[in-house]
Regions:
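Metal-dependent nuclease catalytic cores that hydrolyze phosphodiester bonds in DNA/RNA
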Residues: 1-130, 137-139, 150
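Metal-dependent nuclease catalytic regions and adjoining charged, substrate-binding loops involved
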Residues: 4-5, 143-157, 162-244
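Generic beta-sheet signal
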Residues: 94, 133, 177-179
Length: 244
């Protein structure tokens, strides 16, 4: 007997899960700092909106499907950590106090939390080294293979450089890994410390915070709301409703 209700049931269950995840996300405390994971983004005004926890435009919150993608990324990170340990890497995800490796700067208003530190392991690597992992789609995975990290994903590269600088792990290349979520292929790259990139990102954070302290609204990235960065920004309407 054919089941003509499968689509309706899938939609119903999916909606229930979406709403539950969105409610849970709404209860999370807002960040009161600039995160290292976002300091490589193009638009400084967007980072100001993030820092102030400015309400997003109507309908621009993260839907349940996107929240599940984020959750998948955390699970994939745990799996990759287990696989690296299985391969002989002494990977530490927590420090001696049981806390995630991280740093704070500018009176706690700039922070970052690294995936881990590898302190020993197979030959051919220099220890200790920072470890950072991402779960990515096929297109991003291909771009990483073709262009490498700095050219294909500058936001990730900035994050790595900041962790190397502030965690004192700049002497040895970091190990950046990415897992293709579609076929679980692994990409790995040694990332040399980019001192200039880390310094520019730190200076940028200070400039953004100074502007926030003086109520200065930093310039938009573009002169038109149809710019690609603006189209995907959750504060697009708010930003472009302002006089400048």
């Amino acid at each position: 007997m054919l089941d003509f209700n499968t689509h309706d049931l899938s939609e119903h269950v999916g909606t229930l899960v979406d709403k539950a995840m969105e409610r849970e996300a709404d209860l999370l405390p807002p960040r009161a700092y600039l995160g290292a994971s976002s300091l490589g983004e193009d638009c400084t005004r967007r980072l100001q909106f993030q820092y102030f926890n400015t309400p997003k435009d109507a309908g621009r919150h993260f839907p349940g499907r996107v929240l599940r993608v984020f959750a998948r990324g955390h699970r994939v990170e745990d799996w990759m950590a287990d696989w690296l340990r299985l391969a002989g890497f002494d990977l530490r995800a927590r420090n001696e106090h049981g806390e995630q490796f991280g740093f704070t700067a500018v009176d706690g208003r700039m922070r970052g939390h690294a995936d881990g530190v590898i302190v020993a392991g197979p030959s051919g690597f220099c220890y200790p080294m920072l470890w950072e992992n991402k779960a990515v789609g096929t297109q991003t995975f291909r771009e990483l293979r073709k262009k490498r990290l700095a050219a294909s994903r500058p936001v990730y590269a900035t994050q790595v450089a900041l962790y190397q600088a502030y965690l004192g792990l700049h002497e040895h290349p970091a190990l950046f890994t990415a897992i293709c979520a579609d076929d679980m292929a692994i990409y790995a790259e040694r990332v040399n410390f980019d001192r200039g990139l880390a310094q520019r990102a730190s200076d940028r954070a200070v400039n953004i915070l100074r502007a926030c302290d003086t109520a200065e609204l930093l310039p938009r990235i573009s002169t038109t709301p149809t710019h690609q960065t603006c189209r995907y920004c959750p504060w697009q309407d708010r930003c472009w409703s302002l006089p400048h």
